[in-house]
């Protein structure tokens, strides 16, 4: 799968002051909210992100920044994206350590993702306002919320009789009272590999 890279203008700060971040944008390239990967990459680079890299078309941006500047960079990038998207996107920000920690958790243990199942993580914009008793299921949509962490939820999506799979974002937002954005388990593992500099298969 292709990725794109860009470099922002040089800065006098030492590279050791910077940390690698993942920005997960909500509702990008759906419902007419279209932004190309090059434009997404350039928005973060021009906002001050370093070593910017995008992955897939679902709004995944990896970049380096000083911890004290990262929120300003995200805010400036979102302002640049507003004309294309019609509104500034909601962004869920995570560090490499946080993404690696997701892979060490075991909520999907025993869920081998056969052809009739999909696995998702919903990244939340904040801590859950509600902590429902688990699992929470929506049989009409074939969705099961199986685990709620500090800012992530694990969801299994079962194939419906019509052959479609339910998408978990609205389901999770109703359950925990916080907005979020979903990525399937395969994408999460590939993003973790990108963080570590490994290959993406």
What are the language-model segments listed below?
Residues 1-11:
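Short Lys/Arg-rich cationic patches that frequently serve as NLS/NoLS or arginine-rich RNA/DNA-binding motifs
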Residues 5, 14-58, 62-201:
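Surface-exposed, charge/polar-rich loops and edge strands
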């Amino acid at each position: 799968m292709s990725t794109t890279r860009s470099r922002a203008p040089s800065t006098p700060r030492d590279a050791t002051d910077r940390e690698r971040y993942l920005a997960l944008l909500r509702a990008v390239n759906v419902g007419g909210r279209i932004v190309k990967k090059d434009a997404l990459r350039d928005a973060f680079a021009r906002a001050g992100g370093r070593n910017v890299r995008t992955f897939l078309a679902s709004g995944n941006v990896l970049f380096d920044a000083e911890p004290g500047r990262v929120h300003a960079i995200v805010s400036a990038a979102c302002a640049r994206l507003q004309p294309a998207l019609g509104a500034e996107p909601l962004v869920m920000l995570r560090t490499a350590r946080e993404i690696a920690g997701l892979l060490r958790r075991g909520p999907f243990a025993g869920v081998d993702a056969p052809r009739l199942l999909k696995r998702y993580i919903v990244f939340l914009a904040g801590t859950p306002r509600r902590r429902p008793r688990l699992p929470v299921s929506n049989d009409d949509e074939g969705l099961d919320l199986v685990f709620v962490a500090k800012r992530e939820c694990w969801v299994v999506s079962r194939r419906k009789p019509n052959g479609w799979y339910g998408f978990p974002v609205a389901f999770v937002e109703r359950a925990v009272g916080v907005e979020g954005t979903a990525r399937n388990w395969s994408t999460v593992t590939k993003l973790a590999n990108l963080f570590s500099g490994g290959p993406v298969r």
